[in-house]
Amino acid sequence: MAHRTWGGRFGEGPDALAARFNASLAFDRALWREDLWQNRVHARMLHAVGLLSAEELEAILKGLDRIEEEIEAGTFPWREELEDVHMNLEARLTELVGPPGGKLHTARSRNDQVATDLRLYLRGAIDELLALLLALRRVLVREAEKHLDPLYVLPGYTHLQRAQPVLLAHWFLAYYEMLKRDAGRLEDAKERLNESPLGAAALAGTGFPIDRHFTARELGFKAPMRNSLDAVASRDFALEVLSALNIGMLHLSRMAEELILYSTEEFGFVEVPDAFATGSSIMPQKKNPDILELIRAKAGRVLGALVGLSAVVKGLPLAYNKDLQEDKEPLLDALATYRDSLRLLAALLPGLKWRRERMWRAAEGGYTLATELADYLAEKGLPFREAHHVVGRLVRRLVEEGRALKDLTLEELQAHHPLFAEDALPLLRLETAIHRRRSYGGTAPEAVRERLEEAKKEVGLD
């Protein structure tokens, strides 16, 4: 048992399958940079409080530098029997520098060590995601600006039934708003997780004269965590990040779903770039939007990670339990999934080919301008609910006759209600309806242009 850091208590080694089941090296080795950073800071703190000599500190820091070089060169001797990244680095350090390496773990447990590593890792991962979100938001802004022309109109839908026409630019900016909130959630999560568990030790703190404020400051944390039990036992910070990732992926999934629908022959609004589609092994004509479909599917994967970790922590007593080892694998996978999805959409969206004429015809159909007629009657003084019934009866008649709203004459309108006058006829044109939706946040070109200019400033494109 000498090769195991905790072997002194045990008379025999673990079962081979149990040892493999217990090991986390396959996924927590991703934290090696954070663990090295933490080790360096912890060593300097131990020296500052008199627990390491200058010579021991120098040896440890040189050893950690050597380990970093080995890992980057791919020559580091990872050993699964040492269970995790922490013990692998410590064991190798001791091999390189001797007894000083064994002193590095003074006043520290793997419990506070892994919690610190994970917070450091998430801090960096969030920064990367925020940069990717900014890049995708810029793409959405550019696409909105490119398609601001009122000729780029598509049907807006409720219940997946044609409802009212909207500008394509308005559609792009709708997803911009969602992604802006997604970025805000990640920023909030980063703010809350940016406290240091280091120094909480196993669960009760330590009797050594450590300086937790020193290590917190050197690792870029706002402050040390105030309760040692909370520091090692809590994973709400990971759940909060997963929740933000889940909501972010839901937004990307909704966008992907719409683009999948719009790219079908039945809709025919858009064509997906060849670089982000695949073919069929049997049907030569097929062009499948696989990347969009996978983004849609992988949203479920991230949701599963959130639900899974919630189930892990829901009944855990304080403080640390081995169950918490199950936090990293789903979290790391969810981060990678969201990261890749953001990158793919940022590359895919500029290559979409929008079919303006097909969109226009679809926006004209489905009686999407019926609300304009109801609003007209309401503006003339008729209670809106009554106006709604008048136009509803008119639409029913047109449906029965197989006619469109634009086919109506003034006489037919007045036959349904005498308040209809000559100025109602322009409302049967798509361009008129679009320009009328000029309320703040509406789809009128001037309203969309106003929001677009604000969005450009928000993402640094002004």
Swiss-Prot record:
Family: Belongs to the lyase 1 family. Argininosuccinate lyase subfamily.
Subcellular localization(s) per the UniProt record: Cytoplasm
Pathway annotation from the record: Amino-acid biosynthesis; L-arginine biosynthesis; L-arginine from L-ornithine and carbamoyl phosphate: step 3/3
Species name: Thermus thermophilus (strain ATCC BAA-163 / DSM 7039 / HB27)
Protein name per Swiss-Prot or TrEMBL: Argininosuccinate lyase
Catalytic reactions of this protein: 2-(N(omega)-L-arginino)succinate = fumarate + L-arginine
InterPro entries: Arg_succ_lyase_C, Argininosuccinate_lyase, Fumarase/histidase_N, Fumarate_lyase_CS, Fumarate_lyase_fam, Fumarate_lyase_N, L-Aspartase-like
MF terms in GO: argininosuccinate lyase activity
Alphabetized Pfam families for the sequence: ASL_C2 (PF14698), Lyase_1 (PF00206)
Domain of life: Bacteria
Entry EC number(s): 4.3.2.1
Stored SUPFAM superfamilies: L-aspartase-like
EC main group: lyase
Keywords: Amino-acid biosynthesis, Arginine biosynthesis, Cytoplasm, Lyase
Disulphide connectivity of cysteines: none
GO biological process: arginine biosynthetic process via ornithine; L-arginine biosynthetic process
Annotated GO CC locations: cytosol
